[in-house]
């Protein structure tokens, strides 16, 4: 696969994470640039690892992985998105205490995994092509880091405009991403 095809693949793979990061940036109250970089790194590393896992598993059990990856992604995104929607409707007198809870490492990792399961499926497909999987995975990870960092900063400016609705919208975006993943695999 040539470099332009690799870049197109990488940025296409980062779109789910980009959309989720806009929602995350909007929910947080004035996230700093280092928060955006940290989130970008988490998403980027996970997005780089999942095609490697998929590539390795592609030699052993591709039919089983491809049968279930979309259901796992859908379920994780539905749960995370549903949680955000419910939290968005709760009255919260002190928004500062919500910031830490909504930006926990566990939640970031879980969201990153959910949005990167399609990259694992791509990795399975790449196992049957003549590609340098390590190079491709690194490009996917870097593209995701850039897009997530950018998404967080865009969300930072959208959040104050939307207020508490940002969390509801962010949750709906995650649910929408999950539904889209399910639709693409079942449709």
From Swiss-Prot:
Membrane topology term: Multi-pass membrane protein
Subcellular location: Cell inner membrane
Matching Pfam families: Mntp (PF02659)
GO CC terms in record: plasma membrane
Cited InterPro entries: Mntp/YtaF, Put_MntP
UniProt entry keywords in alphabetical sequence: Cell inner membrane, Cell membrane, Ion transport, Manganese, Membrane, Transmembrane, Transmembrane helix, Transport
Residue intervals passing through the bilayer: 3-23, 41-61, 62-82, 107-129, 143-163, 166-186
GO molecular function annotation: manganese ion transmembrane transporter activity
Entry similarity comment: Belongs to the MntP (TC 9.B.29) family.
Xref: NCBIfam families: PRK11469.1
Function of the molecule: Probably functions as a manganese efflux pump.
The protein's name in its UniProt record: Putative manganese efflux pump MntP
Lineage: Bacteria, Pseudomonadati, Pseudomonadota, Gammaproteobacteria, Enterobacterales
Gene behind the chain: mntP
